[in-house]
Amino acid sequence: MLRVIVLGAAAGGGVPQWNCGCPVCRAAFDDPRLARTQASLAISADNAHWFLINASPDLRQQIIATPQLHPRAGALRHSPIAGVILTNGEVDAVAGLLSMREGAPFSIYAHDKVLAILRANSIFNVLNESIVARRPVATDQPFEPLLPDGTPSGLEITAFEVPGKGAWYLEGRTHPGGDSQSGDTLGLTITDKSTGQSLHVLTACARVTDDLKARLAGAPLLLFDGTVWRDDELITAGLGTKTGQAMGHIAMAGDDGAIAALADLDIGQKLFVHINNSNPALLAHSAERGQLETAGWQIPADGTEVTL
């Protein structure tokens, strides 16, 4: 049985952001039930060994809030987390690795480009490579992530290129002009080898291409980039100077938005993740929430679990 837990559903900075008084953040400060941590997922084929999809800066808090990720009772050192699959090199995706430095064996799976980012930053040397293996992932080549003792996990994962962009903190250094390059942004197809059930994860996506539509069509579960409702919302709200497209994220709404682009693909459950604090769809009674729910989408709370 394939299980996925939404450890965190928010984009960078979480909800509320520490210094933000926008309507969504103000509501979350006033009612902590509205708060969401930064985007990360956990997946498992056996409900005993788990793989993280990205390691958010809130990872320690997310582990504490998720009993399935707690150390085994009676063990001095133990974690059911067998590995981390990174879909990009953004701070939001890699910073949580630093909270996993206490000597537990696991593997990091990522594109060569992201592994190079980790090698180039000596702070990640706290993850001793004799204990924490770094395993390159090639696109469009299925692989089975292994448990720390080398046994199969029961999962098959295929990474694929997604329209996006490079990490913000590398703009102008490795990405002249800010254009996306191979390995910058990956989507994942995750399959339970025993049942054949599969899901797709795209925590970042700049646009929906025909090839992407063909890949996602008929999927029982999709977790998709929900960063912004409108492309210009950060600008119009006075919260930033970039559009969603400039940040490598498609809008939910609009003729070219995710809701319209993915409307006719016969996808079972559709969840938005990586949702920015500027996005009014985070408010349960907003018109935007009503529109996306009418279109068959969900905004998950942290801790939401889906089983296939």
Swiss-Prot record:
Record's keyword annotation contains Transport: yes
SUPFAM superfamilies on file: Metallo-hydrolase/oxidoreductase
Alphabetic keyword roster: PQQ biosynthesis, Transport
Domain of life: Bacteria
One example of a Gene Ontology biological process annotation: pyrroloquinoline quinone biosynthetic process
InterPro entries per UniProt: Metallo-B-lactamas, PQQ_synth_PqqB, RibonucZ/Hydroxyglut_hydro
Metabolic or biological pathway, per its Swiss-Prot or TrEMBL entry: Cofactor biosynthesis; pyrroloquinoline quinone biosynthesis
Residues in the signal sequence: none
HAMAP family per record: PQQ_syn_PqqB
Stated family: Belongs to the PqqB family.
Chain's role: May be involved in the transport of PQQ or its precursor to the periplasm.
Stated name of the protein: Coenzyme PQQ synthesis protein B
Lineage: Bacteria, Pseudomonadati, Pseudomonadota, Alphaproteobacteria, Hyphomicrobiales
Gene: pqqB
